[in-house]
Amino acid sequence: MVKLADGSEKGLKGHFKEDFSHRTRIGLAPRAGHVDRDAPFKRIATEEAWTFPALVKAQVDYFESGAAKADDSLKMGAMFSKMPSLQEMLQDLGELRIAHMDELGIDRQLLLLTAPGVQVVKPGDGTALAREANDIAADACARHPDRFSALAAFDPRDVAGSVTELERAAKLGLNGAVLNSHWQGHYIDEQDYWPILEALEANDLALYIHPTAPFNGAHYETRGFFGALGGFPHDVWLHTMGIIFSGAFDRFPKLRLVIGHMGECMPLQLYRFDWMQGNADNRAGLRGGQPPVKLQHPVSYYFHNNIWITTSGVAWEPAIKFCMDVLGPERVLYAMDYPYQQSYDEVAAYDRMDIAPDLKKMLMEDNARRVFNLPA
């Protein structure tokens, strides 16, 4: 337990009161271990969530208005709003968060505005909330420059406002941008939103696509799979493949895309993606009636040149080694997924992994610095 300035103890063990936080060690979960406090690298965690009260209220108000009944991401946001200790951790960008980082051995967090983000509030309100979020994040980074970096929020429904806000975020010194996947069933591969991709490339900002619950996903909800067990990876998979097959990377070849949770399983399918692309090029109908597509490169090329993945929530040595092998060790970044998934034993598991020291330093520190232009 860590003592805060007011004398209270707010260690991770026992901090959560909500039932969803009580987990049993089963299956592949890492065994108990000890974190190396003298590791020859900094631990930079690159998918670490936060939020702020005005956004939580705006999400709940929009949910309760009934204006977007088919959007399970709003249901998810409303559910999280009723978890006080989760909200305490999400909304703290100071003493409590840093105490938890110290307890876990994390040197720096990359802050991402948590799902469902600013794109699921009342239309017209998202850009102002994004601006407020980015000011809060920039202030936290200024107050704790050795501990926090942050990605910018934007509301893709307001394309012109998003472009302006991304330009402002770059001037604020933010280190990229985060999009919590779809907004009422729309995705950034649709060409109406390409000015946002152009702005990201022009301002040298990597885009992190973070999961949210799928749109109109009753079949996920009834089975209890709209989150990490199904809906999250499926939605980011759809979003990422849409960006690739739209030709966006051919149009914006310097665009950088980051996806979490070990690439949402996509690295395992690179062979099949290339094989199916070879059958779909210039042939209408093979992709569910879509028009013919001719990309400049195989799908795997974009994973090797435009896409990076993080290990958020997957502290599993075989998967990490596989992804480092098929994508390249420079394309895999460490992440924890605080506060949703946090584990001292997972951090210790990274220390134990049988990975060459230079490659482990790339995983834990160097790759994050390069992709997100973090300070040395």
Task: Label each residue range with its predicted role.
Residues P156, P211-F215, Y338-Y340:
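Short glycine-enriched loops at secondary-structure junctions
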Residues L112-P116:
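Short loop/turn segments at strand-loop or loop-helix junctions that form parts
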Residues G117-K122:
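A short acidic, helix-capping loop that chelates divalent metal ions and anchors anionic groups
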Residues R168-L327, R331:
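Catalytic pocket-lining loop regions of alpha/beta-barrel enzymes
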Residues E48-A49, P211, M262, Y338:
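Generic detector of well-ordered alpha-helical packing
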Residues E103-L111, I209, F215-N216:
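Short coil-to-beta-strand
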Residues G126-N134, D189-P195:
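Charged helix-capping and loop-helix junction motifs
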Residues V2-I44, T51-R108, D135-R143, T164-R168, ...:
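Mid-to-C-terminal alpha-helical segments outside catalytic/metal-binding sites
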